[in-house]
C-alpha cells in the first residue's frame, strides 16, 4: 500500500497505543506462571499477536473474549507444538521464545518472517549453547531441542542487542539453579533490561543486578500469576511528539512520564532543541517553537532515530545523532533509510558508521521508500504531512506496532489518501 500526503498542519489530541515491549514481556511472564493472569490494556498489533500465537501453539490458553481491554492467560500448560511456530517479523518474539523453548522438554521450530531473517541471532544461540541447549538456524527456521537446564552461568556481549539478555532473564527463573548472566561488554539499550526486571517483579521474580548491569543474577523461583497493566508506548509516541515540535500543538495521553521506557527521553531532546514541553499525570503536550540543532546520543534509545532525524531536518543548524550503529540491524538499515529519505526531501545528511550528521533546512515532498519498516513509515508520514506532496511505500507496515497510525494522523488533520 502506498500513502499520499498533502500539505497540512496537523495538531490536536491523541492517545497512543499500549507498549509493545511491555505487552510481550507480560505475555511471556504470564505464560510461565501457575494459575490465571490478566494482561490489562494489551497492545493489539502484529508483533504482540505473534507472541500470543506462538504461546498458543505451545499449549498456553489465552482468552481474548473480553476484547481489547484484557487478556486472560492460564499459565504453565506448555505442551509440544503440533507444527511450526510463526514469529512473523517480531524479533522480540523470536528471541524471547527461543530462550523459553530452550527450557521446555521438547523440540520447537520457530519461523521468522522475511525481514526478521536478516536480524542477528548468533549471540543468543551461543549463549544457549553454553547452557547445553541444542539450537541452530536452518534458513528461516530456528530449531530448538529443549531440556531441563542445569547449568547456571552464561556470558554474552551486551552491546549488540538487549533482547538477548532479556530473553535469558525471562527463562532464568525456570532453570534448575537459576542463571548468573555476565555481560562481556556494557549493555546497549539498558532501559529495556530495567523494563524486563520490572516485568519480572510484577510476577514475583527477584532479580539482582550490579550497578553497571554487567552482572545479573536470578535465582530459581516460581512465576506468580498477576494482574499486569500495560502502559502507553513512548516509541510509538515519538513521531507525534516530533509533529508537535515542527507543526502545531499536540496533546498526547496514555504516556507515563516516570516510565522506564528508553524513548521517554524524546521529550528531553525536543526541549533541548527549543520545543515547549508540558506534562502531567499520564499526558504530554508539545508546542512548536523554532528548533535548533542537537547533539544526541541514542545508544540507549535507538528506536528514536527516525523521529528525531525528522525533527532535526526542520531545525536550524546541524544535528549529530550518535550511538546509532545498531540501527543498521533493525527492520531495515535505518541509517540508510533515514539518509535516503531525507536526501530525497532536499536535506543535506552525512551517514557515518555510528552517527548521522543532519543539516537542518526546508524539506520538500518526495517519494519515500519505507523499506517495510514501521518506524521509517511513521516518521516520514509525519514529515510528509507537514511538507506535502509525499508518497510513502509499504505504508501498511505500521501494523507491526501501531495499526491505527494513519487513522490517528488523519484525526489530527493530516491529509492522508491511499494511492491506487
Curated annotation (Swiss-Prot):
Q: Which UniProt keywords apply?
A: Amino-acid biosynthesis, Aromatic amino acid biosynthesis, Cytoplasm, Transferase
Write down the top EC class of this protein.
transferase
Q: Which residues bind phosphoenolpyruvate?
A: 20, 119, 163, 334, 375, 400
- Identify the InterPro entries for this entry: Enolpyruvate_Tfrase_dom, Enolpyruvate_Tfrase_sf, EPSP_synthase, EPSP_synthase_CS, RNA3'P_cycl/enolpyr_Trfase_a/b
Q: Where does 3-phosphoshikimate bind?
A: 20-21, 25, 161-163, 189, 303, 326, 330
Q: Which GO terms describe its biological process?
A: amino acid biosynthetic process; aromatic amino acid family biosynthetic process; chorismate biosynthetic process
Give coiled-coil spans as residue ranges: none
Pathway involvement?
Answer: Metabolic intermediate biosynthesis; chorismate biosynthesis; chorismate from D-erythrose 4-phosphate and phosphoenolpyruvate: step 6/7
Q: In the UniProt record, does the keyword Cytoplasm occur?
A: yes
* Active-site residues from the entry: 303
**Gene3D superfamilies tied to this protein:** Enolpyruvate transferase domain
Q: Which GO terms describe its molecular function?
A: 3-phosphoshikimate 1-carboxyvinyltransferase activity
GO CC annotations, alphabetized: cytoplasm
Report which reactions are catalysed by this protein: 3-phosphoshikimate + phosphoenolpyruvate = 5-O-(1-carboxyvinyl)-3-phosphoshikimate + phosphate
Localization terms from the record: Cytoplasm
The record ties this protein, via HAMAP family, to: EPSP_synth
Task: Quote the function comment for this protein.
Answer: Catalyzes the transfer of the enolpyruvyl moiety of phosphoenolpyruvate (PEP) to the 5-hydroxyl of shikimate-3-phosphate (S3P) to produce enolpyruvyl shikimate-3-phosphate and inorganic phosphate.
Q: How does the record describe its quaternary structure?
A: Monomer.
The similarity comment for this entry is: Belongs to the EPSP synthase family.
Name of this protein? 3-phosphoshikimate 1-carboxyvinyltransferase
Source organism of this protein record: Dehalococcoides mccartyi (strain ATCC BAA-2100 / JCM 16839 / KCTC 5957 / BAV1)
Amino acid at each position: 500500500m502506498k500513502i499520499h500526503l498533502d500539505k497540512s498542519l496537523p495538531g490536536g489530541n491523541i492517545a497512543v497505543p499500549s507498549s509493545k515491549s511491555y505487552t510481550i514481556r507480560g505475555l511471556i511472564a504470564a505464560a510461565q506462571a501457575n494459575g490465571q493472569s490478566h494482561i490489562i490494556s494489551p497492545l493489539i498489533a502484529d508483533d504482540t499477536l505473534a507472541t500470543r500465537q506462538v504461546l498458543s501453539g505451545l499449549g498456553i490458553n489465552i482468552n481474548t473474549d473480553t476484547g481489547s481491554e484484557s487478556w486472560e492467560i492460564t499459565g504453565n500448560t506448555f505442551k509440544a507444538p503440533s507444527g511450526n511456530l510463526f514469529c512473523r517479523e517480531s524479533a522480540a518474539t523470536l528471541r524471547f521464545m527461543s530462550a523459553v523453548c530452550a527450557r521446555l522438554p521438547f523440540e520447537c521450530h520457530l519461523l521468522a518472517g522475511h525481514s526478521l531473517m536478516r536480524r542477528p541471532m548468533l549471540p543468543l544461540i551461543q549463549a544457549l549453547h553454553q547452557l547445553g541447549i541444542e539450537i541452530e538456524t536452518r534458513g528461516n527456521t530456528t530449531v530448538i531441542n529443549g531440556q531441563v537446564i542445569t547449568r547456571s552461568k552464561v556470558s554474552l556481549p551486551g552491546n549488540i542487542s538487549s533482547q538477548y539478555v532479556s530473553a535469558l532473564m525471562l527463562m532464568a527463573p525456570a532453570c534448575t539453579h537459576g542463571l548468573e548472566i555476565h555481560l562481556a561488554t556494557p549493555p546497549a539499550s539498558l532501559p529495556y533490561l530495567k523494563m524486563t526486571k520490572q516485568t519480572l517483579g510484577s510476577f514475583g521474580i527477584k532479580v539482582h543486578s550490579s550497578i553497571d548491569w554487567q552482572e545479573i543474577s536470578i535465582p530459581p523461583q516460581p512465576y506468580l500469576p498477576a494482574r499486569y497493566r500495560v502502559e502507553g508506548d513512548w516509541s510509538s509516541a515519538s513521531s507525534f511528539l516530533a509533529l508537535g515540535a515542527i507543526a502545531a500543538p499536540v496533546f498526547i495521553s496514555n504516556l507515563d512520564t516516570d516510565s522506564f521506557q528508553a524513548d521517554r527521553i524524546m521529550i528531553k531532546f525536543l526541549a533541548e532543541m527549543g520545543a515547549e514541553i508540558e506534562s502531567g499525570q499520564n499526558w504530554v503536550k508539545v508546542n512548536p517553537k523554532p528548533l535548533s540543532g542537537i547533539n544526541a546520543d541514542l545508544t540507549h534509545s535507538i528506536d528514536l532515530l527516525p523521529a528525531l532525524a525528522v525533527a532535526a531536518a526542520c531545525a536550524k543548524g546541524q544535528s549529530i545523532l550518535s550511538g546509532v550503529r545498531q540501527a543498521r540491524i533493525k527492520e531495515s538499515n535505518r541509517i540508510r533509510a533515514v539518509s535516503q529519505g531525507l536526501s530525497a526531501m532536499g536535506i543535506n545528511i552525512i551517514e557515518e558508521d555510528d552517527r548521522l550528521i543532519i543539516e537542518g533546512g526546508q524539506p520538500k515532498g518526495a517519494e519515500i521508500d519505507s523499506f517495510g519498516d514501521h518506524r521509517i513509515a511513521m516518521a516520514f508520514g509525519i514529515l510528509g504531512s507537514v511538507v506535502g506532496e509525499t508518497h510513502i511505500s509499504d505504508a501498511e507496515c505500521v501494523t507491526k506496532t501501531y495499526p491505527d497510525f494513519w487513522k490517528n494522523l488523519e484525526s489530527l488533520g493530516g491529509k492522508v489518501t491511499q494511492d491506487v
